[in-house]
Each structure stands twice: as structure tokens, then as C-alpha cells.
């Protein structure tokens, strides 16, 4: 929920700490 970016999340998926990952957007 801190270093969450749509681009990074789309590639590796949701990052640690990231919740509610939907449609390429995290947190």
C-alpha cells in the first residue's frame, strides 16, 4: 500500500502490502 504503481502491479502483480489489486491498479 506504499510503493504501489499500476505499471509495476500489472507486471508482477500485486506488491507486498498492497490490497485490492484490480485491473492493473493496486491500493
Swiss-Prot record:
The keyword Secreted applies. Keywords: Alpha-amylase inhibitor, Protease inhibitor, Secreted, Serine protease inhibitor. CM proteins would be involved in the cooking quality of pasta. InterPro entries: Allergen/tryp_amyl_inhib_CS (IPR006105). Its main location: secreted. It comes from Triticum aestivum. This is Alpha-amylase/trypsin inhibitor CM17. Developing endosperm.
Amino acid at each position: 500500500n506504499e510503493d504501489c504503481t499500476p505499471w509495476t502491479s500489472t507486471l508482477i502483480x500485486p506488491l507486498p502490502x498492497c490490497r485490492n489489486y484490480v485491473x492493473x491498479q493496486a491500493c
